Swiss-Prot record:
Region: Disordered, residue numbers: 151-174
Recorded family membership: Belongs to the TMEM208 family.
Record keywords: Autophagy, Endoplasmic reticulum, Membrane, Transmembrane, Transmembrane helix
GN (gene name): tmem208
Native source organism of the sequence: Xenopus laevis (African clawed frog)
GO biological process annotation, one example: autophagy
Gene Ontology cellular component terms for the protein in this record: endoplasmic reticulum membrane; intracellular membrane-bounded organelle; vacuole
Role according to the record: May function as a negative regulator of endoplasmic reticulum-stress induced autophagy.
Record-given protein name: Transmembrane protein 208
Transmembrane portions of the chain: 25-45, 51-68, 105-126
Subcellular compartments: Endoplasmic reticulum membrane
Topology versus the membrane: Multi-pass membrane protein
Length: 174
C-alpha cells in the first residue's frame, strides 16, 4: 500500500551525504570492473589479447571518466565562508533525473566490460545505451512533436464560439 500524503523532501545535508555515498559506490564499481578486466586480460588471456581488447578497455575508461565527472559536477556542494553548507548539489538519487541515466550507463559499461573479458561480442550489449537514448528522445521530444495536431492554428475564441453553438443546438434538441 502506498503511503498517504505528501512525500517528504530531503534536506541539504542529507542530499550532500547521500551524494558522497553514491559517488564512492560508483567509484568502487568503476575501479572494480576495470581492475578485474585488466587483471583477467593481463594475467589469464594475455596471449589472446588483441587491439580490440585494449581498445574496449580505453573506451570504457573514457565512458567511466565522463560519467563520473558528470555525476561529480552535478553533486558539487557549495559552502559559505564559515564552512556551513549552502547547497547540497543536485540529488543523484532522484528518480527520473539525469543522474539516473548516467548511473545506468556506468552499470551497463561495468557489466559489459567484465563480460567482455570472456568474449568481445558482449560489447554489442552496449548498443542498448544509444537505443535507450533514441527511445527517450522519440517518446519525450520527437513523437509528441510529429503527432501534434494543428488545432493551435484556429484562434481560441472561435473554438469557444463553436462549443457554445453546439451546446445550444443540443439544448434545442431536448
Amino acid at each position: 500500500m502506498a503511503p498517504k500524503g505528501k512525500v517528504g523532501t530531503k534536506g541539504k545535508k542529507q542530499i550532500y551525504e547521500e551524494n558522497k555515498e553514491t559517488l564512492s559506490f560508483y567509484l568502487r564499481i568503476i575501479l572494480g570492473a576495470t581492475v578485474l578486466c585488466g587483471a583477467i586480460n593481463l594475467g589469464v588471456f594475455y596471449s589472446s589479447s588483441n587491439f580490440w581488447t585494449w581498445a574496449t578497455l580505453v573506451f570504457s575508461g573514457i565512458v567511466y571518466a565522463g560519467a563520473y565527472r558528470s555525476m561529480r559536477s552535478m553533486a558539487q556542494a557549495s559552502f559559505s565562508e564559515d564552512g556551513s553548507l549552502l547547497d547540497g548539489g543536485i540529488d543523484l538519487n532522484m528518480e527520473q533525473g539525469m543522474a539516473e541515466h548516467i548511473k545506468d550507463i556506468v552499470l551497463l559499461t561495468a557489466i559489459v566490460q567484465v563480460l567482455s573479458c570472456f568474449s568481445l561480442y558482449f560489447w554489442y550489449f552496449w548498443l542498448l545505451a544509444p537505443g535507450r537514448a533514441l527511445y527517450l528522445l522519440w517518446v519525450n521530444v520527437l513523437g509528441p512533436w510529429f503527432t501534434a495536431d494543428n488545432s493551435s492554428t484556429v484562434p481560441q475564441e472561435q473554438n469557444e464560439k463553436r462549443q457554445r453553438r453546439q451546446e445550444r443546438r443540443q439544448m434545442k434538441r431536448f
